[in-house]
Amino acid sequence: MAKPIILTVDDDMSVSQAITRDLRSRYADRYRIIRATSGAEALESLAELARRDLDVALIVSDHRMPGMTGIELLELSRPVTPGAKRVLLTAYADTDVAIRAINEIGLD
């Protein structure tokens, strides 16, 4: 049986690599860790994973990215991966964004 997948999404390559490295060091025995560098790339990856009937357990996304915010990505990902948990990361102290994410897209 294939390992469930954790998808990380961040347009900053150094941040993306660091998050992926940290997740792999802790969870590689139980999860397959993959990454995308944009919301559009993440949605393409999620669609392909769904076509292959692979389980996405967690999506970890940066909030501020060009083209699509993390909130938009997590909202658009819901129909494709309804069972996945979702985490929104931001380096900014933006309380309004956090409240919107929790209320509008049901972040845990």
Regions found by a protein language model. Name each.
Residues 3, 29-30, 54-58, 80-85:
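His-Asp phosphorelay/catalytic-motif detector in bacterial-type signaling
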Residues 12-18:
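Short acidic/polar segment at the start of the alpha1 helix of CheY-like receiver
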Residues 20, 26, 35-58:
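Acidic, metal-coordinating helix/loop segments flanking the phosphotransfer/catalytic sites
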Residues 47-54, 76-83, 104-105:
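Conserved phosphotransfer cores of two-component systems
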Residues 65:
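Receiver (REC) domain active-site loop signature in two-component systems and cognate sites
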Residues 68-72, 79, 93-108:
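Alpha4 helix (beta4-alpha4-beta5 surface) of REC/receiver domains from two-component response regulators
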